[in-house]
């Protein structure tokens, strides 16, 4: 499954889109700050679970940064899935009127297996052991906000 779902941050969603989010994440707390595209990732994750299938989306890079990572990625990676390949952030432009361009990433997801994973950046293709939700060659660690200092 491949696609280029709509990019809408939580503050730019209309009432219908907020209702979509509520339906998709009905069993999940803390979803309201997720970008709209998180719906596609979550539904695709459910769709390929325990199947011989993969999915990939072009998405804004926001789901690989900040609060989005700790909110979205455990929902995917804790279902026995992993990032199969990823193209790190690059500027996407098209011929649309008023197109300002946006920083995007391309992320492919699969059920966990032992085959190679690839990380792309411009003209570089790197075979890696793991691709983290931050699209780096590291383990899956999540940085979450805190209300109290560490010490």
Where are the regions a protein language model picked out?
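Signature of N6-adenine DNA methyltransferases within the class I
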Residues: 1-151
């Amino acid at each position: 499954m491949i696609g280029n779902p709509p990019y809408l941050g939580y503050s730019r969603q209309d009432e219908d889109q907020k209702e979509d989010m509520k339906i998709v994440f009905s069993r999940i707390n803390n979803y309201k700050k997720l970008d709209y595209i998180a719906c596609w990732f979550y539904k695709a994750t459910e769709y390929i679970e325990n199947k011989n299938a993969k999915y990939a989306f072009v998405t804004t890079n926001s789901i690989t940064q900040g609060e989005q990572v700790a909110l979205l990625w455990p929902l995917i990676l804790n279902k026995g899935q992993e990032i199969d390949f990823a193209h790190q952030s690059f500027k996407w432009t098209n011929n649309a009127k008023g197109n300002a361009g946006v920083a995007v990433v391309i992320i492919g997801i699969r059920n966990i297996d032992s085959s190679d994973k690839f990380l792309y950046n411009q003209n570089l293709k790197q075979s890696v052991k793991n691709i983290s939700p931050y699209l780096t060659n590291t383990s899956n660690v999540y940085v979450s906000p805190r209300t109290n200092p560490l010490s």
